[in-house]
């Protein structure tokens, strides 16, 4: 008997984990495995359904990731998304894939041409496309069920085999009825019940941590953010006093952040906390460094070195807890995924690290972590705190870093946070922060010519950090932020607002 579990096979798509997340939103357990998993392993997992993810390769190319054709003989429903649909087409008899004359990227209008279980209750609506190849001919026994103005086969299905394919991405929020399409696949095609929840995930993860760690000592790095707080709390629930938390003040934090971390984690969590003042050490290492990737690598390496030194003082700590999220993993790249930038929690770690990593949140997105934080009973000021990168203000200062620039950025960032909270937008916005570019501009203040730094205000809305849109803040709020910054922050004479979405930009500037 098949279990209420969905297997997502990852072909290197940037949205692979997002698929699994959407499945979990439907209260169905999901796991991700690489595309080259063996048939025996799939049988052992015994899923109720399989989803082929998208991917950056061409199914017609020599480096196309393939799967054993035996997967189609397992009598398990399959949904192919983007590359996954093209792969299904290429491997099944009668199907053909071709390079389209024009690619299709971004929003498109889906026209449903034939109703099946996948499209029950679904009407013509906006979907999100990202492809160049397209299905030329559907496999034997399949019917074309949807199209767009550019793509004649935007969806296909074989109800008898329970094989379905969509060229668009139902997992992203820009596909208006995408979650309902996924629900149809889960409940109408696969027949799952939908009884899994976050409490189950917490219990499973706590059991896994107990088994992995045994009686070993563990250290955790606290930053004050929700990720490290939730990760540390989960580990503490699993192993208790075997965990010691360490807070490294690298001098790249926001205003008042170090004090808040020490106060909150000692008082709220009652977990032993070691405070390390490493501000001078980090700034010395970063002196003269301009390249953002080099900054990240230096900070990641120095962070681990500090941890190793503190661990030796504490005793034999074998494990390091990190609040790595899946969005971090995606942007750092994998075997089949493209690298966007290395993350302090992933690609910024040195190879010669003395710790084994515990990353209980590695397969989760930020909003899921917040749900777990609420289940664990963490305070709102931690659960709803906006994301802050591991390298801190180092990647919000373009170019070289020094004490003066850090002070300018801290003051400007503090004003932004104060005003956005006061206006009631803090929880609605995914991130809001200041960026200090490596340039100056001419201004006039008090009838005197000035030559000062501009501050870039970045505020975005998002559900998961995979995509983001610039926040439509009221003009009055923008004016208030700008006025306060140029009047209260020395050496700043201009404020500009970044209105770029992700993609093409990333949320952070570096």
Curated annotation (Swiss-Prot):
Residues involved in ATP binding: 223-229
The GMPS ATP-PPase domain covers which part of the protein? 196-385
According to UniProt, the reaction catalysed is: XMP + L-glutamine + ATP + H2O = GMP + L-glutamate + AMP + diphosphate + 2 H(+)
Q: Where is the Glutamine amidotransferase type-1 domain?
A: 5-195
| GO CC annotations, alphabetized | cytosol
> Which terms does the record give in the GO molecular function aspect?
ATP binding; GMP synthase activity
Cite the active-site annotation: 82 (nucleophile), 169, 171
Q: Which CDD domains match?
A: GATase1_GMP_Synthase, GMP_synthase_C
Q: In which pathway does it act?
A: Purine metabolism; GMP biosynthesis; GMP from XMP (L-Gln route): step 1/1
Q: Provide the E.C. number(s) assigned to this enzyme.
A: 6.3.5.2
| Family annotation (InterPro entries) | Class_I_gatase-like, GATASE, GMP_synth_C, GMP_synth_GATase, GMP_synthase, GMPS_ATP_PPase_dom, NAD/GMP_synthase, Rossmann-like_a/b/a_fold
Record carries keyword Nucleotide-binding: yes
Known role: Catalyzes the synthesis of GMP from XMP.
Q: How does it assemble?
A: Homodimer.
What is the name listed in the Swiss-Prot or TrEMBL entry for this protein? GMP synthase [glutamine-hydrolyzing]
The species is Halothermothrix orenii (strain H 168 / OCM 544 / DSM 9562)
């Amino acid at each position: 008997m098949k279990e209420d579990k969905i297997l997502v096979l990852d072909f290197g798509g940037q949205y692979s984990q997002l698929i699994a997340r959407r499945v979990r939103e439907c209260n169905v357990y999901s796991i991700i495995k690489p595309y080259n998993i063996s048939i025996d392993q799939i049988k052992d997992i015994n899923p109720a359904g399989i989803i082929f993810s998208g991917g950056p390769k061409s199914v017609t190319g020599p480096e196309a990731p393939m799967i054993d054709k035996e997967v189609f003989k397992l009598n398990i429903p399959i949904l192919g998304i983007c590359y996954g649909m093209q792969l299904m087409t290429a491997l099944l008899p009668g199907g053909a894939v071709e390079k389209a004359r024009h690619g299709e990227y971004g929003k498109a209008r889906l026209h449903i041409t034939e109703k099946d279980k996948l499209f029950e209750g679904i009407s013509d609506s906006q979907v999100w496309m990202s492809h160049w190849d397209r299905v030329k001919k559907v496999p034997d026994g399949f019917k074309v069920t949807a199209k767009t103005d550019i793509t004649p086969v935007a969806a296909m299905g074989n109800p008898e085999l329970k094989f379905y394919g969509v060229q668009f991405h139902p997992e992203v929020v820009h596909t208006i009825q995408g979650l309902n399409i996924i629900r149809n696949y889960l409940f109408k095609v696969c027949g799952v019940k939908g009884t899994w929840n976050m409490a189950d995930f917490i219990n499973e993860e706590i059991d896994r941590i107990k088994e992995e760690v045994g009686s070993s000592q563990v250290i955790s790095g606290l930053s004050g953010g929700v990720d490290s707080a939730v990760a540390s709390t989960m580990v503490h629930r699993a192993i208790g006093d075997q965990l010691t938390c360490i807070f490294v003040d690298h001098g790249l934090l926001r205003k008042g952040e170090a004090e808040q971390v020490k106060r909150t984690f000692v008082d709220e969590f009652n977990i032993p906390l070691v405070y390390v003042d490493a501000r001078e050490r980090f700034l010395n290492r970063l002196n003269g460094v301009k390249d953002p990737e080099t900054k990240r690598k230096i900070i990641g390496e120095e962070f681990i070195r500090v941890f190793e030194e503190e661990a030796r003082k504490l005793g034999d700590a074998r494990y390091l807890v990190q609040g790595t999220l899946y969005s971090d993993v995606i942007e750092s790249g994998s075997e089949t995924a493209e690298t966007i930038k290395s993350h302090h929690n992933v690609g910024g770690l040195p190879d010669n690290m003395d710790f084994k990593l515990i990353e209980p949140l590695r397969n989760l997105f930020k909003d899921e972590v917040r749900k777990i934080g609420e289940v664990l009973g963490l305070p709102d000021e931690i659960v709803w705190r906006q994301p802050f990168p591991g390298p801190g203000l180092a990647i919000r200062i373009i170019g070289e870093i020094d004490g003066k620039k850090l002070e300018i950025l801290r003051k400007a960032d503090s004003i932004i946070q104060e005003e956005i909270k006061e206006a009631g937008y803090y929880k609605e916005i995914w991130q809001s922060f200041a960026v200090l570019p490596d340039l100056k501009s001419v201004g006039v203040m008090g009838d005197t010519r000035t030559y000062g730094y501009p501050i870039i205000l970045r505020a975005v809305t998002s559900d998961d950090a995979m995509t983001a849109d610039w926040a439509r803040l009221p003009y009055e709020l923008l004016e208030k932020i700008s006025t306060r910054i140029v009047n209260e922050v020395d050496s700043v004479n201009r404020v500009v607002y970044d209105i770029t979405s992700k993609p093409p930009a990333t949320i952070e500037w570096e």
